[in-house]
Amino acid sequence: MSVTMREMLEAGVHFGHQTRFWNPKMAPYIFGHRNRIHIVNLEKTLGMYQEAMKYIKQLSSNRGTVLFVGTKRQARETIAAEAARAGMPYVDQRWLGGMLTNFKTIKTSIKRLKELEALVEDGSMEKLSKKEALMFEREKIKLEKSIGGIKDMGGIPDAIFVVDVGYHKGAITEAAKLGIPVIGVVDTNHSPEGVAYIIPGNDDSSKAIMLYARGVADAILEGRASATNDLVESIKGGDDFVEVNEQA
């Protein structure tokens, strides 16, 4: 979970967008500009990143769920891999409208996906005609692509982690309606509004995206481990010897 300013520099976290595309609401997090590119103040980014990771760790220690969201080409693989490593749901292809606000409908699609997966696992698909099998296979692939990352998400997540808030305005709007905290990477060309835990920085570099996502996954795993350790300690502490009077 620990990240240094040098690691942020090496990942290019400090590189913002062209100055002409800037969002004035990001002014407090901008150090200056070089060659018409805004430079993010990494002293602020590091502190805000650490605050966000602290929150995620605490949430995870209380068995909270964090939904990873990153559908940009350079983010997809990393988001899926790090979410899977942390045992968390993710959206890596396309944000479907209503994924949070209309989760009942999404659950119907998840149920259908699991039914199709069961057909494959128990061999039932092989008993169908070629035409039917092909139709079901296409349906399964389509559902896997759109909701495969959230098929084990039992309900609304406790928080969402978003790479590139401008690219995922729909997700942030839905989270706001439901009061779900957003941990978001916000570049110099976007607004930080609606983001509870802002991580000011580059949202285009694959190295930077890896740094953020790996940090979130590490924080989740650390939180889960600390909760397990606390449970073990509490069990040990309550394991006092009690003498039983057999004559009673």
From Swiss-Prot:
GO terms for cellular component: cytosolic small ribosomal subunit. NCBIfam families: rpsB_bact (TIGR01011). The keyword Ribosomal protein applies. Keywords: Ribonucleoprotein, Ribosomal protein. One of its GO terms (molecular function) is structural constituent of ribosome. Belongs to the universal ribosomal protein uS2 family. Transmembrane segments: none annotated. This is Small ribosomal subunit protein uS2. InterPro entries: Ribosomal_uS2, Ribosomal_uS2_bac/mit/plastid, Ribosomal_uS2_CS, Ribosomal_uS2_flav_dom_sf. It comes from the Bacteria. Coiled coil: none annotated. Pfam families: Ribosomal_S2. One of its GO terms (biological process) is translation.
